[in-house]
């Protein structure tokens, strides 16, 4: 069974960061080692919360502890999400380097959280660090539309522009870019666009966009987690993308139908593993 070290925020109540990522990856047959960068009572969109960030040095100490018992060599991938400070971001880089040195076959998937995540805003300097340092280290990245523009340093309004931006980033190191949410001026307003791009291929997919009174938090974290899990299970990029599109839709639909604010991960767990409604991806902007 594959193992992934997941470095993200965590909420006790609800689903954001590792609280949105761990169970879906486990449900898909992947062992998850959660390292929580932030421990909160709940996500901050509620307006009240309690909790704090973990010290960056302790992040590295925890991973050193795994290495000390000889288990780090079994880590097949690292997934990073919210990093609250430049010190945490640097610690994540050192952790990835340690994992890759221990297991040369391990890979790193970066969800470059640069804006507000569950109401949490990273400290000044995190965005600049991510843009400058992480593409060279990452084997894959999962930006949203805004983060893609920051990574590429350009405005994006169409699918073609998004594909070109992804290819700019790919030249710096990643083999695959998953755009978790793409705004396209040519797409229908009731559709949610996702895009995945490699050096030579690109696929776009759409799912229904639901009119929530207030949108649930953690959908992006769920998206990255499912994609990583399916890739660890051996799916091709396209197959992992299509499974991610379908499974995330199932969770979002279950949440909308139940009139809930927090993602209905447990209720929709069978759909995460075996989605009943699929949305085929089609080739776009391929060389």
UniProtKB/Swiss-Prot annotation:
A molecular-function term among this protein's GO annotations: magnesium ion binding
Which PANTHER family does the UniProt record give?
A: PYRIDOXAL KINASE
Q: Which residues bind substrate?
A: 9, 44-45, 221
The name this protein goes by in its record: Pyridoxal kinase PdxY
Q: Name a single GO cellular component.
A: cytosol
Quick one: a GO biological-process term for this protein? pyridoxal 5'-phosphate salvage
Catalysed reaction(s) here are: pyridoxal + ATP = pyridoxal 5'-phosphate + ADP + H(+)
Keywords for this entry?
A: ATP-binding, Kinase, Magnesium, Nucleotide-binding, Transferase
Question: InterPro entries attached here?
Answer: PM/HMP-P_kinase-1, PyrdxlKinase, Pyridoxal_kinase_PdxY, Ribokinase-like
Q: Which domain of life is it from?
A: Bacteria
- Similarity comment text for this entry: Belongs to the pyridoxine kinase family. PdxY subfamily.
Q: Which gene encodes it?
A: pdxY
Q: Which species?
A: Burkholderia pseudomallei (strain 1710b)
Pathway terms, separated by semicolons? Cofactor metabolism; pyridoxal 5'-phosphate salvage; pyridoxal 5'-phosphate from pyridoxal: step 1/1
Q: Cofactors per UniProt?
A: Mg(2+)
Any idea of its EC number? Answer: 2.7.1.35
User: Which CDD domains does this UniProt record tie to the protein?
Assistant: pyridoxal_pyridoxamine_kinase
The UniProt function text for this chain reads: Pyridoxal kinase involved in the salvage pathway of pyridoxal 5'-phosphate (PLP). Catalyzes the phosphorylation of pyridoxal to PLP.
Q: What is the lineage of its organism?
A: Bacteria, Pseudomonadati, Pseudomonadota, Betaproteobacteria, Burkholderiales
């Amino acid at each position: 069974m594959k193992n992934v070290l997941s470095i993200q925020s965590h909420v006790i109540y609800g689903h954001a960061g590792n609280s949105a990522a761990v169970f879906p990856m486990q449900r898909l047959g992947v062992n998850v080692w959660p390292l929580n960068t932030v421990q909160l009572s709940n996500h901050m969109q509620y307006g009240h919360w309690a909790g704090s960030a973990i010290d960056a040095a302790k992040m590295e100490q925890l991973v050193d502890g795994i290495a000390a018992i000889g288990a780090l060599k079994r880590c097949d991938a690292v997934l990073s999400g919210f990093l609250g400070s430049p010190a945490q971001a640097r610690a994540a880089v050192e952790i990835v380097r340690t994992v890759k040195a221990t297991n040369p076959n391990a890979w790193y998937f970066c969800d470059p959280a640069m804006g507000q995540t569950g109401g949490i805003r990273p400290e000044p300097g995190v965005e600049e660090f991510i843009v400058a340092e992480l593409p060279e280290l990452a084997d894959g990245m999962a930006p949203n539309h805004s983060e893609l523009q920051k990574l590429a340093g350009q405005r994006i309004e169409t699918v073609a522009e998004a594909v070109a931006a992804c290819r700019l980033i790919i030249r710096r190191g990643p083999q695959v870019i998953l755009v978790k949410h793409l705004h396209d001026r040519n797409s229908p307003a009731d559709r949610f666009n996702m895009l995945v791009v490699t050096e030579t291929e690109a696929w776009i997919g759409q799912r229904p966009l639901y009119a929530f009174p207030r949108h649930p938090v953690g959908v992006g974290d769920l998206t990255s987690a499912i994609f990583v899990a399916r890739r660890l299970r051996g799916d091709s990029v396209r197959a992992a993308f299509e499974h991610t599109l379908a499974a995330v839709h199932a969770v979002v639909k279950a949440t909308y139908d139940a009139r809930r604010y927090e993602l209905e991960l447990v209720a929709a767990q069978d759909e995460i593993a075996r989605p009943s409604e699929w949305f085929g991806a089609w080739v776009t902007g391929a060389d």
